[in-house]
């Protein structure tokens, strides 16, 4: 028996060529590994089969929209820097990560006459900055508008290439509408209009918003996972989704962000706020029944969330099968359905 609290228990070996650097096209041809808990059986389908296999349930998606959060600039010295915006704060301040040495007071220059000043260095390696243009402080919506012109799609660190115009389409769900994420809720990337229409005919669909932060890629550093401090992300639950969660209808959460949002609301009854819920085999889901998700990094909080549904042993067994069957992994990869 593996120790559910030991970080090493969530490790597995993944051949580099199984990390997807672009999505399967057409989307419905992406592969789908299905695990049926009642039958304790695994079978292999494609996303186009999803509506045929899904039990009766309501479906909840995350409608967050990924911003072009990566920008390139220079210090006054001329040295180049790279910034990843993470989260808006109060008083027009922003939390971000900066590649390149900076200190409090460092001024950074970007295209379109945009400037930023570093106000604080945080212990988690993030930086607090304030943006200006023509000496006027920029608010969040103004910053998002500027990012749409000078920013780059914030591809995950394991996709080792520059972003392209295709990524602006690929790395965004078709129902994305509320700006603020710096990473996509990747289970949602598999859906096209036809698939959504088909599901709408047979299932009740609703939406939450959880702005996925850069913390989703942060590794667990403690050998005992109970010592991990979970990152916090803004969420808001629509009235329809709230009513569905408050009912006793069975629920499918599309993606780990939806799961955390559903479970955080179920525990706190707060329809809006900041979610820092860490699900793992000793902190199981209390409300959500089924999970649709991608295949996640070793030792990540995301694979631990999967294990909160089906246990550590079964999770690692299924991941081994997925590798052997050459499923594609991570953000642009294939999917897994737990029913």
Curated annotation (Swiss-Prot):
Localization per record: Cytoplasm
Highest rank taxon of the organism: Bacteria
GO BP terms: queuosine biosynthetic process; tRNA wobble guanine modification
Keyword Cytoplasm: yes
GO molecular function: S-adenosylmethionine:tRNA ribosyltransferase-isomerase activity
Function: Transfers and isomerizes the ribose moiety from AdoMet to the 7-aminomethyl group of 7-deazaguanine (preQ1-tRNA) to give epoxyqueuosine (oQ-tRNA).
UniProt name for this protein: S-adenosylmethionine:tRNA ribosyltransferase-isomerase
Organism, scientific name: Campylobacter fetus subsp. fetus (strain 82-40)
Underlying gene: queA
């Amino acid at each position: 028996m593996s120790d559910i609290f030991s970080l090493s228990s969530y490790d597995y070996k993944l051949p580099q060529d199984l990390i997807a650097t672009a999505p399967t096209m057409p989307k419905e041809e992406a592969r789908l590994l299905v695990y049926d808990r009642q039958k304790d059986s695994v079978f292999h389908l494609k996303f186009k089969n999803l509506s045929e296999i899904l039990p009766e349930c309501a479906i909840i998606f995350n409608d967050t929209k990924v911003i072009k959060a990566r920008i390139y600039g220079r210090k006054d010295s001329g040295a180049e820097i790279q910034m990843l915006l993470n989260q808006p704060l109060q008083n027009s301040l922003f939390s971000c990560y900066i590649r390149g040495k900076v200190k409090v007071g460092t001024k950074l220059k970007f295209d379109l006459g945009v400037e930023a000043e570093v106000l604080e260095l945080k212990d988690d390696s993030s930086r607090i900055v304030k943006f200006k243009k023509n000496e006027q402080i920029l608010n969040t919506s103004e910053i998002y508008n500027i990012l749409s012109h000078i920013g780059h799609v914030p591809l995950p660190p394991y996709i080792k290439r520059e972003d392209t115009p295709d990524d602006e389409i690929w790395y965004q769900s078709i129902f994305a509408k509320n700006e603020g994420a710096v990473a996509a809720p990747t289970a949602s990337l598999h859906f096209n209009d036809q698939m959504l229409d088909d599901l709408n005919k047979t299932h009740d669909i609703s939406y939450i918003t959880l702005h996925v932060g850069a913390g989703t890629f942060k590794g667990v550093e403690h050998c005992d996972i109970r010592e991990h401090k979970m990152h916090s992300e803004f969420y808001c639950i629509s009235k329809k989704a709230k009513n569905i969660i408050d009912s006793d209808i069975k629920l499918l959460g599309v993606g780990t962000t939806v799961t955390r949002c559903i479970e955080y609301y179920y525990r706190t009854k707060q329809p809006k706020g900041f979610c820092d819920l860490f699900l793992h085999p000793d902190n199981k889901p209390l409300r959500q029944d089924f999970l649709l998700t991608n295949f996640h990094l070793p030792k990540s909080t995301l694979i631990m969330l999967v294990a909160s549904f089906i246990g550590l042993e079964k999770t690692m067994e299924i991941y081994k099968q997925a590798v052997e069957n050459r499923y594609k992994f991570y953000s642009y990869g294939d999917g897994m359905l737990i029913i």
